[in-house]
Amino acid sequence: MRHGDISSSHDTVGVAVVNYKMPRLHTKKEVIENAKNIANMIVGMKQGLPGMDLVIFPEYSTMGIMYDRKEMFETATTIPGPETEIFAEACRKANTWGVFSLTGEQHEEHPHKNPYNTLVLINNKGEIVQKYRKIIPWCPIEGWYPGDTTYVTEGPKGIKISLIICDDGNYPEIWRDCAMKGAELIVRCQGYMYPAKEQQIMMAKTMAWANNVYVAVANATGFDGVYSYFGHSAIIGFDGRTLGECGEEENGIQYAEISLSQIRDFRQNAQSQNHLFKLLHRGYTGIIQSGEGDKGVAECPFDFYRTWVMDAEKARENVEKITRTTIGTAECPIEGIPHEGKEKEASV
């Protein structure tokens, strides 16, 4: 793992993350113009970072947040579509891979159902090689139709890549799912705003450590008239240490080289902190010394996960017992979100 140079090598993947300024757009024409700006940025970045193999832009960077529902449906796109064609041409021209946000992608039953919040991974030939739909939209605010699975794709120089989006990353399950599928780099594109800056910085580092995986975070910056975005796009080593991190500057860029051989050697040979291996070989030292084989215990010890897999409604019932039974809360009502009880009277 290296930071500070502009190069890369046969063993390292050059990764750039962009603190893209959150756009405030309203029409398809404005979206296309912004996509062209992103494309021009890619070509310029490659000139300054000749080792760049992969460039990552934040959630909402292409379309911004359409706070108007009508505008959200009017600007929802298809994949492939005009935006991805612009990005594909830029990736070919710059000879680099890219991760791009489409908010939103038209639902199969468009316009009768809400769009998806989608990322695409485009290779240096301009081909879309992964399309990921956000599994856990940021409720109650986001109205995206939820996706249902994660993916792993072989990326530049053979590194295995998974994509996740913003609020997805608050749930350890999604990181573990990607890592257990073989991901070596988990890309988290986010449009995260204050006040959750410190929590999100910690989450990315912790999940890198817990899953023995590289993490690249691209976050928005600026103020779009509603939210203020904190940036801090970063590249994090599989040991949880930050290789490079932006501040809050608009359109700031960080760059690092992540080693293929180092992560693969670690996963093969590390012992006390090899979290992926140890989870499925629990207590192997004690099992060996007890004469019960040399593999440890593989069975899942966690009641919640067993219940969730075998009886999702029962798992939901259990969580409602310790939280609440309605989607909304009368203490802080949000329009369109059902709740029980009277609204809390405002204090005088």
From Swiss-Prot:
InterPro entries: Aliph_Amidase/BUP (IPR050345), Aliphatic_amidase (IPR023719), C-N_Hydrolase (IPR003010), C-N_Hydrolase_sf (IPR036526)
Membrane-crossing segments per the record: none
Assigned keywords, A-Z: Hydrolase
EC number: 3.5.1.4
Domain of life: Bacteria
GO molecular function: amidase activity
PROSITE patterns: CN_HYDROLASE (PS50263)
CDD domains named among the record's database cross-references: aliphatic_amidase (cd07565)
PANTHER family: ALIPHATIC AMIDASE (PTHR43674:SF14), NITRILASE C965.09-RELATED (PTHR43674)
The protein's role, per its UniProt record: Catalyzes the hydrolysis of short-chain aliphatic amides to their corresponding organic acids with release of ammonia. Efficiently hydrolyzes propionamide, acetamide and acrylamide, but shows a very weak activity with aromatic and longer chain aliphatic amides. Also exhibits in vitro acyl transferase activity, transferring the acyl moiety of short-chain amides to hydroxylamine to form hydroxamates.
Protein family per UniProt: Belongs to the carbon-nitrogen hydrolase superfamily. Aliphatic amidase family.
Designated name of the protein: Aliphatic amidase
The species this protein was found in: Geobacillus stearothermophilus (Bacillus stearothermophilus)
